[in-house]
Amino acid sequence: MLRLAPNGNLRFLQSESFEALFGGAEANVAVGLANFGIDSAFVTKLPKHEIGQAAVNSLRRYGVDTCYIARGGDRVGIYYCEKGAGPRPGKVIYDRAGSAVSLSETSDYDFTAALKGADWFHITGITAGVVKTDVIIQALEAAKEAGATVSIDYNYRSKLWTRDEMKKVMRQIVPYADVFIGGDTDACDLLGEKPDDPMRTLYEKYGFRAVASTSRESISASDNIIGARLITDGKEYFSKKYPVRIVDRVGGGDAFDAGLIYAMLNGYDPQYTVEFAVASSCLKHTVEGDFCIAEVSEAAALADGKADGRVLR
């Protein structure tokens, strides 16, 4: 997507110009993994015009494979992002109707070729709210056929659809997952009930390899305390709590996903996996834009408790 944002902490109503960047949930994960040294590819549909090409170039810049991106249609999805500060929360306005990817069909993609030899496939509920369900299911079936691990981040967005609308779609999609990322309310949506421990119940009902959820204590829009929980092999693991001074919180959950995927691909033990994933998310909160521009060594230093903010010379 194209992200248009007022400069600094200006509000929408004040702004006479907008900063233009590109991002989006799965794209953010792909870039995060590429920055961690993982071969990553991104599949979507974008127009052939210059704005569509600029979106492609924004991924290529970080080494993401774009050769399976379908080209056509007229619009790139847009979202407007107003940063929060102190007691004032941030705001997002979506303008995605009629985007190339929202109108795309199964015939636009060759998921079998795109997923050949893939170890992992990641998708989110944001995409499920925009892209036709049969396209998503085709991608998931190709991923399972390729033997890839499938992760799904529930990622409910109230400005895209209602929870009831989302439940109908996600209950078709989530059974394909090996790894589920979400929160207690998301788990209750899928379960149709409110157990004492929704994520544990979901983990057991679906037989996932792992489930993960992040926690966020909001001191203000500028200061949060971030942590996470991971359930795998029947056991649960909690990360440390990390205080974060926020530069840009958009993409923080996607950076968590990238860190989780990286750690699991590399066979990290569960405790270090959740620490690394949260460290990745914390680093993203300090970076402007959607993408997590961080190296493995930086996330590892934070996860190991060795990051002190001093200048590295």
Provide a role label for each language-model segment:
Residues 1-65, 85-87, 104-106, 238-240, ...:
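Glycine-rich phosphate/adenosyl-contacting loop at the front of the ribokinase-like
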Residues 1-2, 48, 156, 186, ...:
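Short, glycine/acidic-enriched loop or turn micro-motifs at the edges of active sites
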Residues 58-60, 66, 84-236, 243, ...:
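Ribokinase/PfkB-type carbohydrate-kinase core domain
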Residues 77-79, 83:
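Short alpha-helix plus adjacent loop in nuclease-associated cores
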Residues 33, 183, 253:
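Short, conserved phosphate/pyrophosphate- and ester-handling motifs at nucleotide-, phospho-/glycolipid
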Residues 240-306, 313:
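Conserved post-catalytic alpha-helical subdomain immediately downstream of the catalytic base
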Residues 68-76:
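A short, structured active-site edge motif that brings together acidic residues
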